[in-house]
Regions:
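Conserved catalytic cores of soluble enzyme domains
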Residues: 7, 11-18, 22-162
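Gly-rich Lys/Arg/Thr-decorated short loops/hinges at beta-loop-alpha junctions or inter-strand turns
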Residues: 1-6
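Intrinsically disordered, low-complexity segments enriched in small/flexible residues
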Residues: 89-112, 116, 122, 128, ...
Length: 252
């Protein structure tokens, strides 16, 4: 698996795994049949990314959901950063995605974990329209009913997003200035700063003019490249090894 490949320093294998992971996420999004995620307990990292790519999600109230990759020195690379960039663009007021994007950036960079399905909606891991059930015994029944309802109502997959406006280099610069202040105040480490910069670079669409239009593949490629750059660093590898051994994060 990914951890084994990393520990064996097989970065080429990791790169292939990430590409396949992204293809799977996109397959969930653009499947010709409806996809409904049934969440009970934990949906962390890649699990959360799969949930975000489904047409609907049904979650038990006490589910823990989040993109926690930054805690081990990485960033979401299964489409998680791309999804937040897309959400910011789709819900932008006056065509500017940055006001929303800066909140989404904090969610990802701080590895914020929703400790309930309601909080997952607040953090935009779940949609406002997603269903929350109180009893986990009802979960599969409700999820199946939603999938059947979508299928029976003439379901069509969403159109591919080919014109996503991004915050570009101005957005990156604004976030980077905030990261500099945090670093100078010793609130984050040098490696935290690097991780934050990589996340901002991806979510803002790279070094482009603000308002430039990109497609999902552009954002996914930025994700994959940034992930591979981080996973090749000694400090990220130390964080992963420490977490696998102790179950606790390492600040280095």
């Amino acid at each position: 698996d990914l951890a084994d490949a990393l520990m064996a320093s097989k970065l080429a294998e990791v790169n292939t795994m990430i590409q396949q992971f992204q293809k799977t996420s996109q397959a969930l999004r653009y499947s010709m049949i409806p996809t409904v995620a049934a969440v009970d307990g934990l949906a962390l990292g890649g699990g959360c990314e799969f949930v975000m790519h489904c047409d609907r999600a049904v979650a038990t109230l006490e589910s823990y959901i989040g993109l926690v990759e930054a805690g081990v020195g990485l960033l979401p690379a299964g489409g998680g950063c791309k999804e937040f960039a897309l959400k910011a663009a789709q819900n932008a007021k006056d065509g500017d995605p940055f006001p929303l994007l800066k909140h989404y950036f904090q969610t990802v960079a701080m590895a914020e974990l929703a400790k309930s399905a309601e909080q997952a909606k607040e953090l935009a891991y779940l949609r406002r329209a997603d269903t929350i059930v109180m009893n986990h015994f009802e979960l599969l029944h409700v999820a199946k009913a939603q999938a059947l309802a979508l299928a029976e109502s003439g379901y069509r997959p969403p159109l591919h997003a080919h014109q996503i406006p991004v915050a570009g280099d101005a957005g990156i610069a604004t976030i980077q200035a905030q990261l500099v202040n945090l670093r100078e105040g010793d609130f984050i480490s040098e490696h935290d700063y690097l991780i934050g910069h990589k996340i901002a670079h991806v979510m803002c669409g790279g070094d482009l003019t603000p308002g430039s239009l990109v497609d999902e593949e552009w954002l996914l490629e930025l994700e994959r490249a940034a992930f591979m750059e981080l996973i090749a660093t000694e400090k990220t590898q130390e964080r992963i090894a420490h977490t696998l051994k102790t179950g606790k994060p390492l600040r280095n």
